[in-house]
Amino acid sequence: LVEEGIVSGIIAELQGYSALRREVKYGTNSRIDLLLEYESQPPTYVEVKNCHLRRDGRLAEFPDSVTTRGAKHLDELSEMVRQGHRAVMVFCIQRSDCDAFSVAGDIDPGYAEAFSRARNAGVEALAYGCHVSPQEIKLSHSIPIKD
């Protein structure tokens, strides 16, 4: 869904690339979901997290359980920024009844701390909602991230 959103131009923040590669090895025994390469700027490392949890009104949250692997990915994205690359975490909210996103720190405090460290290191975070119907699910719009 996120790759389709990039290619179609829905994710405006990730445009202008000359090549898009999937599952590229990086960090410590990890693979980045998408690597965007550009003619005249450093590559952009894009990690995608699918989000389904909604507990409070119209607020989507991630994670829905403890994810040490997710925290590791954030630390590795921070390292990519330190090396001069761009790194972006995209939360794909696979439901149409949410209008804001937040990290569920009460479910996984370690992930919340890693998210805060990553943001402070320069990792960008985006959240995108989906249009969901019986026929399809499609990335549709940006959703604000609450701290």
Model region roles, listed by residue range:
Residues I32-D64, L77:
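Conserved catalytic cores of phosphodiester-cleaving nucleases, focusing on short active-site segments
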Residues F62-K72:
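A short acidic, glycine-rich active-site loop
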Residues Y45, M89-F91, A127:
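Structural beta-sheet core signal
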Residues L1-R22:
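Acidic-basic catalytic patches of nuclease active cores, encompassing PD-(D/E)XK
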Residues Q94-D147:
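Domain-level recognition of nuclease-like catalytic cores that cleave nucleotide substrates
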Residues P42, R86-V88, E124:
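Residues at the starts of beta-strands that form the adenosine-phosphate
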Residues Y17, R21-V24, N29, L35-Y38:
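Accessory, non-ATPase domains that flank or precede helicase/AAA+ motor cores in DNA-metabolism machines
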Residues K72-A87:
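Metal-dependent nuclease catalytic cores in nucleic-acid-processing enzymes
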